[in-house]
Amino acid sequence: MHIVLEFFLVTFKVLWAFVLAAAKWLVRPKDKSVAGQVCLITGAGSGLGRLFALEFARRRAQLVLWDINSQSNEETAEMVRSIYRELEAEDSARRAGNATEEEVQPCCNFQVYTYTCDVGKRESVYSTAERVRREVGDVYLLLNNAGVVSGHHLLECPDELIERTMMVNCHAHFWTTKAFLPKMMEMNHGHIVSVASSLGLFSTAGVEDYCASKFGVVGFHESLSHELKAADKDGIKTTLVCPYLVDTGMFRGCRIRKEIEPFLPPLKPDYCVKQAMRAILTDQPMICTPRLMYIVTCMKSILPFEAVVCMYRFLGADKCMYPFIAQRKQATNNNEAKNGI
């Protein structure tokens, strides 16, 4: 009898979860404040990582930027400093206009910290994380964004590039989380954001290593979320970001069927980041952009494999990566010819 009562209770909780989800969809929750919080972003030197840094800077977060390219990372940091200066000027103007203390949020003591780190190397992650703890303090929000793509068919891809893709795109999430999660758990306070991809939910031909790495991120993130729930660490939030193809140049040349592309074009980076920020700041567990990706993922789970293949071929998604791979191969050959290899 006890298990029967528990079954009805669980059923009620499941239905209530649907009600809450619908309510959040109809009435967007208020964004939480990250002002003064230490937010660490990997792969901050370019692309989505840079845009995430600028968005968090506008919200007065204290930023720690990691990238393997120190020059591009410093360029991002300078953009962040420019935003901080604008916020300081706005605060000064408000004070001059006799604004109340609540209306003026301090920003003048904020700094942005840059670290050159190869997240694909465990030792580099752990040593850099130790420097961050010593020089900056405890990290509140960890945004795992760094990623690479090899751009080769499986049988043509050097083993070293496959390993590199897995290390940077997937294994790095393990190292950074192990470095900063203990303090979050001690305080029951923090937020871990995993930037994966729609190719971590469904796959296509020609990017086996990339898909495997992103599927790994999705599995890692979901298991971590369950582990935090099992440990009753409700103060630590997690957000999984799964965007469709983003127009950052990472997959330049990738094309679906030309008749379909106007209805499903590559995402603008700014739009992708703004949607992700909405999810992060409202503690949303997962965000797929565009929303159509939710439907595609569901259909892939319930349809027969041959039906999925038919859909891929209709959309031109079965070989959408082939032009991208051809461009990468041509660029590699041109570089080798230029260098006399």
Curated annotation (Swiss-Prot):
Swiss-Prot/TrEMBL keywords: Endoplasmic reticulum, Lipid metabolism, Membrane, Microsome, NADP, Oxidoreductase, Signal-anchor, Transmembrane, Transmembrane helix
Bilayer topology term: Single-pass membrane protein
UniProt-recorded name of the protein: Retinol dehydrogenase 10
InterPro entries according to UniProt: NAD(P)-bd_dom_sf, Sc_DH/Rdtase_CS, SDR_fam
Major location category of this protein: membrane
Ranges annotated as spanning the membrane: 3-23
Enzyme Commission number(s) from the entry: 1.1.1.300
Protein's pathway: Cofactor metabolism; retinol metabolism
Origin organism lineage: Eukaryota, Metazoa, Chordata, Craniata, Vertebrata
Signal sequence range: none
Organism in which the protein naturally occurs: Xenopus tropicalis
Family: Belongs to the short-chain dehydrogenases/reductases (SDR) family.
Coiled coil: none
Localization of this protein: Microsome membrane; Endoplasmic reticulum membrane
